[in-house]
Amino acid sequence: MLPLNLDSLFTPLAFAFLIMGDGSWDKSGSRIILHLNNFTLIEVNRIQSILLSKFDISSYLVKTPHSDKDRGYILKIPARNVSKVRELISDHIYPTLKYKIGL
């Protein structure tokens, strides 16, 4: 369950922790993927909305096959937004995890 004040808590540092924990780099599409499989659609939509409103980072949702009907979503940040993500959070990412943002 996400806190009601998530938008005020969702800082570049918090975003970096989300990527370090649940993120991956898709080489074929040069995009960042957030594996939010245990979040509900409402929660994932909230995260997506915060990324857009606070950081101007667009994304799109994909339902994973064979997942629970209420959960099992991934959020994909397309290549056109990767440079924004890197600029925003690269200082907060552990060096050994920078591969998750394609660095």
Regions found by a protein language model. Give the residues of each.
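Internal intein/HINT superfamily modules and their associated LAGLIDADG
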Residues: M1-L103
